[in-house]
Structures are given as C-alpha cells and as structure tokens.
Amino acid sequence: DIVLTQSPASLAVSLGQRATISCRASZSVNWYGNSFMZWYZZKPGZPPKLLIYRASNLZSGIPARFSGSGSRTBFTLTIBPVZABDVATYFCZZSBZAPWTFGSGTKLEIKR
C-alpha cells in the first residue's frame, strides 16, 4: 500500500496569513500525466469535504483561497488567506492504487 506522510500534524496561523500543508507519498501517484492526489477538509460532526482533486483541481464550490500543487510524490495544500471558517482537520488521500490511503491529518487552528 502507498503510505502518505503528512506534515505538520498541527498548524496555527493568523487570520489573513497563509497555511501550507505537505503530503509525501511513499511512491509516485502519477498515472498517464495525472497526479492522483486529493485533499479533504473535515470538521467535527460533518462528513469530509473534497477540496482539491488530481493534485491541483479545485472542486466546484470551493473558494479559490484553496489551492493544490505537486507531482509524483510531493504535494502541497495552500490556504491563502486563512479565514476563521477554515478551522478544521485537513487530509491528503491518494487514489492511484487500491486500497486508497489517507494521510494522518493536519489540524489547523487560528493563532490569537
């Protein structure tokens, strides 16, 4: 199985600043020119929400403050600028090789 190493485990960012979350795969998740990496946002009591698919594509309805980048094994989720509503846990997920696997999550908090 592909192992995803996500960092940092937690992150405190001031409102209006940039949050950067990294995800490294144990092997390439590229296939036919696509990077099969997704990013999700999860809030307590709510199902995970897809933010980014295939590494850099913004899901419909997701604000452009969210962006994804990377290829092969190294990927980044950026939130810029961070808003109060972004407090959540963020997960990367690979959809290249079954069983699909998730990173361990990054908890985003607002720095006061």
Curated annotation (Swiss-Prot):
Region described as Complementarity-determining-1: 24-38
Gene Ontology CC: one annotated term: immunoglobulin complex
Complementarity-determining-2 as annotated region, ranges: 54-60
PANTHER family (alphabetical): IMMUNOGLOBULIN LIGHT CHAIN
Framework-2: annotated segments: 39-53
Disulphide linkage map: 23-92
Keyword Disulfide bond: yes
Gene3D superfamilies referenced in this protein's UniProt entry, alphabetically: Immunoglobulins (2.60.40.10)
Chain spans, region Framework-1: 1-23
Any Pfam family: V-set
CDD domains reported in the protein's UniProt record: IgV_L_kappa (cd04980)
Region (Framework-4): 102-111
InterPro entries named among the record's database cross-references: Ig-like_dom, Ig-like_dom_sf, Ig-like_fold, Ig_sub, Ig_V-set, IgV_Light_Chain
Keywords annotated in UniProt: Adaptive immunity, Disulfide bond, Immunity, Immunoglobulin
Region named Framework-3: 61-92
GO terms, biological process: adaptive immune response; immune response
Residues covered by region (Complementarity-determining-3): 93-101
Protein name (Swiss-Prot/TrEMBL): Ig kappa chain V-III region TEPC 124
Lineage: Eukaryota, Metazoa, Chordata, Craniata, Vertebrata
